[in-house]
Amino acid sequence: MAKLRIIPLGGLGEVGKNMTAFEFGDDIVVVDCGSIFPRADMLGIDLVIPDITYLERNRERVRAYLFTHGHEDHIGATPYVLPRVPAPVYGTKLTCALIRGKLAEHNIGNIQFHIVKPKDVIQAGAFSVQFIKVSHSIAGAVAMALTCPGDFKIDYTPIDGEVTDLNTLAAWGSRGVLAMLAESTNVERPGYTMSEKKIGETFHNLFKDAKGRIIIAMFASNLHRIQQVVDNCIEFGRKICFVGRSMVNVTKLAMEIGELKIPQDVFIDVGDLDCYADSEIVVLTTGSQGEPMSGLTRMANSEHRKLQIRQRDTVIISATPIPGNEIMVSRIIDQLYRCGANVIYNRIADVHVSGHACQEELKLMHTLVKPKYFIPVHGEYRMLHRHAQLAQELGMPEDNVIILEMGQALELSEDEANITGPIPTGSVMVDGLGVGDVGNVVLRDRKHLSQDGLIIVVVGVNKETGQVTSGPELISRGFVYVRENEELISGARNVAMNVLQRYDRIEQSDWTSVKNGIKDEMHNYLFDLIKRNPMILPIIMET
């Protein structure tokens, strides 16, 4: 009998980039295909996606992509992965619509989509998959129960909230679940996740008290929260408009498929704002993470063509900063206050709730599903470790709780669990149209350039005689202001000249040693004088 293999390709030791392959015999199904924001030291990088080398090597065996929901950390890599390893896509209506939109932006077609509903069962190779309703901060979220020959069962469960289909999960627990993978994002938080309805109550009070415009920044995918904003607009006689590309695109798509309901007389275009009093306006915008090009940031910096923040505006930031974005969000809040706005954010009012399960909800999931093995996923390593502890506190044997690292695979049978590998995994960086062509060496050079700048040393050498015909000329970028540091630049030029004068003639075979000599001696000269280490790039041209 073949064994079941669980192969994490992302989402372990990190929050984001979620992707897991399940393999049985000749069949592979992939759950989610997400991206993650680049770290601060990944200069110039737009997006980070999983390494799919393993899937590419086994392209003919991939039977399906199964999606839990439509957040970027679960679908963001689809335009880069699906063309390289095509297979049918299964997801709920909104999830499939969001993926279609992403593929259309990249002019990608010929992907089969299958829309599923909770309790649907599909067959993908050896796997039978049941979709189970769960609550999350986006519509159309589902868990999955995977069954394969030999009565192996996997419950892939990003659980959230109180409207999760607990009956179905409990039924699976009664039948016997071999292993459960459950998210770990909020495992450090005791208690329960606050209900999304609480946000609606806060919005109601803020709408009641606001005298001027209300500007709300949130994630465009949080359609339940957007609907609560719309409902308050209707109650208080306000009009709503959307600002920011993703906000406009997602809400338009959601209205088309019936996931968002906005009366025609409530919705207005941003160009029509001047036709209404401030007390009649609500603006829903991107920018809850302080992104430099987002709608809220451009408004705060008076860079938006049609909207600027002004006195009496109430600005609500209905999100918490993603780790790494705290400084950007703080700067935007400061700037909003400088503009005279009344700023409401989660530290001073309940304007955001998490979409992830806290400890008591996780305990309930473990109690209902009763898996033989447990594998914590979707979290940084400390979160995975804490979730493993929680499972043991609930009575699961230590040997049956398995924390996987990237690059490892887990082989499961009814009798044993073994960690195998290595599996090629990691991060692939997307920079513009380039995918995977930027690595650590390029990032190191970018970091060097960003810290100390660049000096280019240009030397002309006669092809026949090997004599220096021009230069050395120094071109500086991001190092010092040349007009105010002419003595320093002149000294650096003399250092380069001294290196060149050691050669009676410069042959092509000497170029490497000449360049290295210029770099080393100019580095020593500049560091001794001003304690800086610019990137030095000598260029020798034949004349």
Each model region followed by its residue ranges:
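Short Gly/Ser/Thr- and Asp/Glu-enriched loop/turn motifs at secondary-structure junctions
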Residues: 117, 405, 532-536
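C-terminal tails and terminal domains of large nucleic-acid-associated
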Residues: 507-543
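A glycine- and charged-residue-rich anion-binding loop/surface
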Residues: 12, 36-40, 61, 345-348, ...
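His/Asp/Glu-rich metal-coordinating catalytic cores
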Residues: 2-66, 71-276, 294-308, 327-331
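Hard-cation-handling environments
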Residues: 189-318, 322-491, 495-507, 515
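Conserved hydrophobic residues forming the short capping helix/wall of the S-adenosyl-L-methionine
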Residues: 103, 391, 526
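RNA-binding accessory domains that recognize and position tRNA/RNA substrates
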Residues: 1-5, 481, 511, 515
